[in-house]
Amino acid sequence: MVVEADKKALICSFCSKKQHEVKKLIAGPAVFICDECIDLCTDIMKEENKVALKQITSSIPTPQKICGILNDYVVGQDQAKKILAVAVYNHYKRLEYIQSGNNDVELNKSNILLIGPTGSGKTVLAQTLAKILDVPFTMADATSLTEAGYVGEDVENILLRLLIASEFNIAKAQKGIIYIDEVDKIARKSENPSITRDVSGEGVQQALLKIMEGTVASVPPQGGRKHPQQDFVQLDTSNILFICGGAFMGIDSIITSRTNHSSIGFAANVNIDKEKNNSEILKSLEIEDLTKFGLIPEFIGRLPIVTTLDELDKEALITILTKPKNAIVKQYQKQFELDDAELVIDDSALETIAEKALAKKTGARGLRSILEHLLLDSMYKVAELKKQRVTITKEVVNGLVEPIMTSLISTKSNKKQPIIADIPA
């Protein structure tokens, strides 16, 4: 509200200028602000945005360097790493270009869709990218999301998590990365548009469209539903990179059905090409397959970069156990080291662990649960015993024997001292 009356009595609460000295004086609850202070605040916020962006773009590595760092943490998936490295590099270079003000060509945002089996590395790829770039990062599970007004989590809560990750630094949050997992679980129930309300499927896809494309969203800083009277934070999502991931179980059948020209009728066997594994089939993925699976065309359009991840074989799982910087075995060895103990897992045991993970079809994610089960009793005991070596063999993995525990204390201390007899002169 612009205050007209008693111009001499009213002053700006920030610069103390009287109303007749400024063009506009806006009244709030017991405070006033003039147009000059508003302009100053706007300039300060713009400058902060520039500084936050400069910190990110000045240190962004090249695609080859990004790929090299990903290699330290993620085994295999070379094509997916290359696509991600280029996409992320181009995304942040786009932000630098926009900030420069030289906008003769409009560069659109390119969000990413990762498709691959459980435990193939989708989540760790997104997490590692955020670490490389040192930008705010958050993860969300699509299965917990519902359309606004229904029981469940609103899509705006994803943005709240990003704000929390950035310590409520709006400028930093607006340059962050959001990873939405299990996005295949929000596919609509049928290929045709639903007549009834699909609040956890198509409804969620519709709700995600705006924030993925770019909008100024009103984010409730205390969560949306428990505090309806709170003030909202305005967050521009135009420059937030969205990475979506999912296993898309059954999409291989849709692809095979489309590519297999010998199939006749809807009841035809789509598993004729048995020599091909899922990874090879996924490489033939087309947009129409995603539509048939249950993603609406508008949602797919917000994810222009689609890449598939390979199913991990036995050799890859063994490598994951031992080679990366954050290898699972290295993590457990460090845990034992903190208790003055030593963990040894022989090669035959590593092979058996990998075989068990393959049989369970849980990929790399299953390796940790197998090791946790194997080492539970040992971790329970070594904290008390100290100075122990725990050895895991193939027989231990197969449940035939218990983990072998031996003392690390030098055997010298256990040796009896020789008795020196008195020799008469």
From Swiss-Prot:
Pfam families named in the record: AAA_2, ClpB_D2-small, zf-C4_ClpX
Keywords: ATP-binding, Chaperone, Metal-binding, Nucleotide-binding, Zinc
InterPro entries: AAA+_ATPase, ATP-dep_Clp_protease_ClpX, ATPase_AAA_core, Clp_ATPase_C, Clp_protease_ATP-bd_su_ClpX, ClpX_bact, P-loop_NTPase, Znf_CppX_C4
UniProt-annotated binding residues for ATP: P117, T118, G119, S120, G121, K122, T123, V124
Binding site for Zn(2+): C12, C15, C34, C37
CDD domains cross-referenced by the UniProt entry: RecA-like_ClpX
The keyword Metal-binding belongs to this UniProt entry's keyword annotation: yes
SMART domains hit by this protein: AAA, ClpB_D2-small, zf-C4_ClpX
GO-annotated cellular components: HslUV protease complex
Example GO biological process: cell division
Function: ATP-dependent specificity component of the Clp protease. It directs the protease to specific substrates. Can perform chaperone functions in the absence of ClpP.
Subunit and interaction comment: Component of the ClpX-ClpP complex. Forms a hexameric ring that, in the presence of ATP, binds to fourteen ClpP subunits assembled into a disk-like structure with a central cavity, resembling the structure of eukaryotic proteasomes.
The protein's name: ATP-dependent Clp protease ATP-binding subunit ClpX
Organism annotation: Rickettsia rickettsii (strain Sheila Smith)
